[in-house]
Regions:
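Core SAM-dependent methyltransferase catalytic element
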Residues: 79-97
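A short, conserved alpha-helix within the catalytic core of class I
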Residues: 14-30
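Short alpha-helix
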Residues: 58-76
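Conserved beta-strand signature within the Rossmann-like core of class I S-adenosyl-L-methionine
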Residues: 26-48
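Short secondary-structure boundary/capping segments
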Residues: 52-58
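Hydrophobic adenine-recognition pocket in adenosine-nucleotide-binding enzymes
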Residues: 11
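A conserved beta-strand element that flanks and buttresses the S-adenosyl-L-methionine
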Residues: 6-7
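Local beta-strand N-terminus motif with an aromatic residue
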Residues: 2-3
Length: 97
């Protein structure tokens, strides 16, 4: 049984930065779970991401908003994108292709 919607808030940066999981694998992992996805992108400039990076080498040049959009757009239609105040974070509503 699949869910109607997956809510992935404050998740991607942990998987990508702390877990070294590439964005394409994250998108592929989430895609079969539900028709719709609400997902948050947390930029490298965010304090939480800086904490994840403080004790490791920054090898995450591909972890950008532009790459995130491009990679997820290959698996989803981006229905809505909303900047979260002045945080640099973005929320996306997506529909599986």
């Amino acid at each position: 049984m699949k869910a109607d919607l997956v809510l992935a808030l404050a998740l991607v940066h942990h998987l990508a930065i702390a877990g070294n999981i590439p964005l394409p694998l994250i998108a592929a992992w989430l895609q079969p779970m539900a028709e719709h996805l609400v997902i948050e992108f947390v930029p490298r400039s965010d304090e939480k991401v800086k904490l994840l990076l403080q004790n490791r080498r920054d090898i995450f040049d591909g972890y950008t908003l532009e790459n995130f959009r491009s990679i997820f757009a290959a698996k989803y239609t981006i229905v809505k994108e909303e900047k979260v105040g002045n945080t640099g974070r973005f929320l996306f509503l997506m529909k599986r292709n």
